[in-house]
Amino acid sequence: MLWEFLSERLSFRDPHDEGGAKNGRDLMKMFTKAAFAAAVLAVGAMGTAKAEEANYVLSTASTGGTYYPVGVALSTLVKVKLQPKQKIGMSAISSAGSGENVRLIREGEAQFGILQGLFGYYAATGTGPLAEVGPQEHLRSVSMLWQNVEQFIIAADAAESGTLSDVTKLSGASMALGRQNSGTIGSNAALMAGLGIDINEAFDLVYAGYGPSAEALQNGQVKGISTPAGVPTGAVSQLLASAGDSVKFLNVTPEELAAADGGRNLWTPYTIAAGTYPGQTEDIQTMAQPNFLATHADLPEEHVYMITKTMYENLPFLQAIHPATKAMAIEAAIAGLPVPLHPGAQRYYEEVGIEIPARLIAQ
């Protein structure tokens, strides 16, 4: 009870109170490290069948995005289904997002975290923004949660093939590829690099969120936009309803996907079904990367197994709490995961008949 009280209070701190935020982080650090140590010591040996008492912390992102409410949904499910008998609890906390979540898991301040797929790849390989700290060899995947679907839309008069290669021919044009320093512009930069394009040199970048980006395309202020998100995306719906045939939603060919992915095995094919958006009469073939649930390799196999099993046996519960989880399906549980599976998650997936590729088996 004390743990739940502190978790709830500290995760709802005033973002403008810097002193309070620091004190909250210090307190959270103390209690989460204690909880993590207690959980591991209580189990004694990894993989024991008996589920000992544990209270885990799930780090998400800011309260205004999707990560936080999905984290609350997951932690609520664990509390309702596992805490009464198995004594496995979970509390969701807000954070600065994927980058901080990697650090929190590494330092034992959180035992689970929601990560963008590309950031998981950076963590696994020690590249990008994690080049200085190196590979996070302790990081493990639990499940894909929902997918960030890549949505490239350009002015119709710039569309030659109607595929992603059209973007590579817009050198010198104004493009809206996300806010500055955002995950959106980071993933767009990685994808374009795979196609041989340095976005900072090739384009006149307009830094904006999805709504303003869509408006800029409709008004002719930019030649193209990219809005990776769950579908349907509100800004895209509004754009296609208003702009009609003056814009073109680009398809991604298998060859373009392979080049853009750059050997990461992160982006996978995704079909936006006809009728998803206004005026969309045909399927759109694009690609998507996962937002996924990560954990620490040292967590007990039995606990991660039970959490994974509980998630997939109670999808209607999750989906009733937040619509983003409607994308979850056992068939897509390991799609695009960038780091090896935790043995507990692997065990559950093998039980339900999912074939695990070698790259996702922890060594």
Q: What kind of feature is each model-predicted range?
A:
Residues 248-306, 348, 356-360:
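C-terminal lobe and pocket-closing loops
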Residues 10, 24, 229-251, 302-363:
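An extracytoplasmic/periplasmic, membrane-proximal ligand-sensing/linker region
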Residues 26-36:
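Bacterial N-terminal signal peptides that target proteins for export
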Residues 75, 106, 114-132, 189-196, ...:
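A ligand-binding cleft/hinge motif common to bilobed small-molecule-binding domains
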